[in-house]
Amino acid sequence: MFVMRCDFVSIFPEYFDVLDISLIGKARRNGLLDLRVHNLREYSEAGRVDSSPYGGGPGMVMSAEPWARAIEHIATGESLVVFPSPSGQPYSHDLAQSLSSEMHIVFCCGRYEGIDNRIYEWTATRLRSSGISIGDYVLNGGEIAALAILEGFVRFIPGVLGNPESLVEESYQYNLLEYPVYTKPAVWRGLEVPDILLSGNHDLIREWRYKKQLEITQKTRPDLYSTHIYETDS
């Protein structure tokens, strides 16, 4: 049975207490995921992991050596080392699907003004590595980004989702956002569920959902809409 291993390295390991809840926690308990958390300070001298930046500037920069020690201790030849970073490649549906087939991912969660750039050069000469960005904004550290990346790809691991068909119609499949969903009651505070969803005609319902996907995607993500239209017409 395929068991993916993910290691998270951070100076705030408490961030990852959430790995024991929801679908990820269930997958972990069922033996589908091997998740391990490491405190970067354990790989440093006297717990010191940062220093002032060469060339001046605000804040502190994380030193390369503790990261190198952690990577050497945790990673193997099969590992992919991921640095969550605004300067990384954009996270996407396709990238999430690709990550789900990895045997071992090591997430290096930086803080402060970033990590000494030499760690990226050093890692790239020894292992497969990648920077990944979850959006055009800056967070206080890489922990939240690492969790978001994990949430995105574990859904593709067989056995994690109770109903695998959920993957087929969710947002970003075929470059379209998801259609609106409704549940009981049929009328809630004067707002009604669209009649077509109560009709029982599955062909019409499928057509309505696709139309709504097109409308929503064109309005909020015209870039995805253009890609979908291009691929459909090709």
From Swiss-Prot:
GO terms for molecular function: tRNA (guanine(37)-N1)-methyltransferase activity. One of its GO terms (biological process) is tRNA N1-guanine methylation. It comes from the Bacteria. Gene3D superfamilies: 3.40.1280.10, tRNA(m1g37)methyltransferase, domain 2. InterPro entries: Alpha/beta_knot_MTases, tRNA_m1G_MeTrfase_C_sf, tRNA_m1G_MeTrfase_TrmD, tRNA_m1G_MTases_N, tRNA_MeTrfase_TRMD/TRM10. HAMAP family: TrmD. SUPFAM superfamilies: alpha/beta knot (SSF75217). The keyword Glycoprotein does not apply. Keywords: Cytoplasm, Methyltransferase, S-adenosyl-L-methionine, Transferase, tRNA processing. This is tRNA (guanine-N(1)-)-methyltransferase. Specifically methylates guanosine-37 in various tRNAs. Homodimer. It is an enzyme of class 2 (transferase). Its main location: cytoplasm. It is found in: Cytoplasm. Its EC number is 2.1.1.228. One of its GO terms (cellular component) is cytosol. It catalyses: guanosine(37) in tRNA + S-adenosyl-L-methionine = N(1)-methylguanosine(37) in tRNA + S-adenosyl-L-homocysteine + H(+). Pfam families: tRNA_m1G_MT. NCBIfam families: PRK00026.1, trmD. Belongs to the RNA methyltransferase TrmD family.
